[in-house]
Swiss-Prot record:
Listed transmembrane segments: none
Record's protein name: Putative speedy protein E7
Protein family per UniProt: Belongs to the Speedy/Ringo family.
Single annotated GO MF: protein kinase binding
Pfam families: Spy1
Species name: Homo sapiens
Top-level taxon of the source organism: Eukaryota
Length: 208
């Protein structure tokens, strides 16, 4: 796919950068009662408006548009997983203009890796990007598929792209200081930035 070549080159050529700092914790006044003050510890978010802007820009990408429309069951792209993409953008530490289509899928894959116990959703990302992979072939057909794959240059190319995707996923994960967990409070904060955004209507619970 055309999206891969440009994104792959830009990500491979990125210079070594300082890892994004971890969010600090501050004490804020929650309640005043006479001379008494109740303090509550709150984590300072590192998500900036520019990270939301990068996310919104990528939503206009034709490949991402097709992917979101393709995921009708919201198995890999419900509102919480998409909110995690924005958080990951803030943690990776890249300038907002450098985020491209490949970064969206890397972040979304990591979000699924973190939140979903089922392996199928992550495989669906590969299925969309590269077509049917070995993991989605029934067991009795695997030997035949292995033979065809050896004879099919396109199948070998798809396999190598998946391997490269996993390599880039690990690099992206390291750029976030290996911090993939996102708290419920952070997810609420992301959605509260623009509560009317159409992606927050992608609620998997409403489909069940």
């Amino acid at each position: 796919m055309e999206w891969w070549d440009k994104s792959e080159e830009s990500l491979e050529e990125e210079p070594r950068k300082v890892l994004a700092p971890e969010p600090e914790e501050i004490w804020v006044a929650e309640m005043l009662c006479g001379l008494k003050m109740k303090l509550k510890r709150r984590r300072v978010s590192l998500v900036l408006p520019e990270h939301h802007e990068a996310f919104n820009r990528l939503l206009e990408d034709p490949v991402i548009k097709r992917f979101l429309a393709w995921d009708k069951g919201l198995r890999v792209s419900d509102k919480y997983l998409l909110a995690m993409v924005i958080v990951y953008f803030s943690r990776a530490g890249l300038p907002s203009w450098q985020y491209q289509c490949i970064h969206f899928f890397l972040a979304l894959y990591l979000a699924n890796d973190m939140e979903e116990d089922d392996e199928d959703p992550k495989q669906n990302i590969f299925y969309f990007l590269y077509g049917k992979t070995r993991s989605r072939i029934p067991l009795l057909r695997k030997r035949r598929f292995q033979l065809c794959r050896c004879m099919n240059p396109r199948a070998r190319k798809n396999r190598s792209q998946i391997v490269l995707f996993q390599k880039l996923r690990f690099q992206f994960f390291c750029s976030m200081s290996c911090r993939a967990w996102v708290s419920p409070e952070e997810l609420e904060e992301i959605q509260a930035y623009d509560p009317e955004h159409w992606v927050w209507a992608r609620d998997r619970a409403r489909l069940s």
